[in-house]
């Protein structure tokens, strides 16, 4: 009986490890698919670019940059995409993130409803672009933060899911 109990105990300890490993493999595969769809929808290669998402007290920032400052094709593709999404987001159209992530990201419903209380401003930066998102509406702000936290997690950027106290632009 003790031998059986010992074996059962060892198996019980092993189950969470197998479960965690399976979860990691699933997440890695999911991020690979997100990047593949992103390359297609956004028009630039995620292997040649860096994506960042920042939460700000009044909204947030979506930023993409070419890794190589001489990669003019990636820089121009990023800029084209960011001009496009700032215009679409301003109209309440979040179909691109839905296509990339294969689901509607959290916060999108509220951001669509409150689109007139949110600004999406495109800025070119040295190696790419950013979209600055701002609002004074507390419900819109929560939705923006939910949206950006989802982006951080689903893209696996490693960006902080906490609000940065620095307000730029």
Report residues per predicted region:
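N-terminal signal peptide c-region/cleavage motif recognized by signal peptidases
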Residues: 14-16
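Sec-dependent signal peptide recognition
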Residues: 2-10
């Amino acid at each position: 009986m003790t031998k059986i109990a010992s074996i059962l105990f060892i198996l019980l300890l092993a189950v969470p490890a197998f479960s965690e490993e399976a979860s990691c493999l699933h997440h890695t595969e999911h991020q690979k698919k997100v990047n593949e769809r992103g390359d297609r929808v956004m028009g630039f290669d995620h292997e040649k670019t860096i994506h960042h998402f920042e939460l700000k007290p009044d909204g947030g920032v979506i930023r993409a940059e070419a890794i190589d400052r001489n990669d003019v094709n990636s820089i121009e593709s990023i800029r084209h995409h960011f001009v496009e999404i700032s215009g679409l987001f301003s109209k309440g159209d979040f179909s691109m993130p839905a296509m990339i992530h294969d689901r509607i990201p959290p916060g999108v419903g509220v951001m669509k409803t409150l689109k007139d209380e949110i600004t999406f401003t495109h800025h070119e930066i040295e190696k790419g672009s950013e979209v600055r998102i701002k609002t004074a509406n507390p419900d819109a702000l929560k939705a923006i933060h939910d949206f950006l936290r989802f982006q951080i997690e689903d893209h696996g950027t490693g960006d902080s899911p906490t609000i940065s106290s620095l307000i730029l632009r």
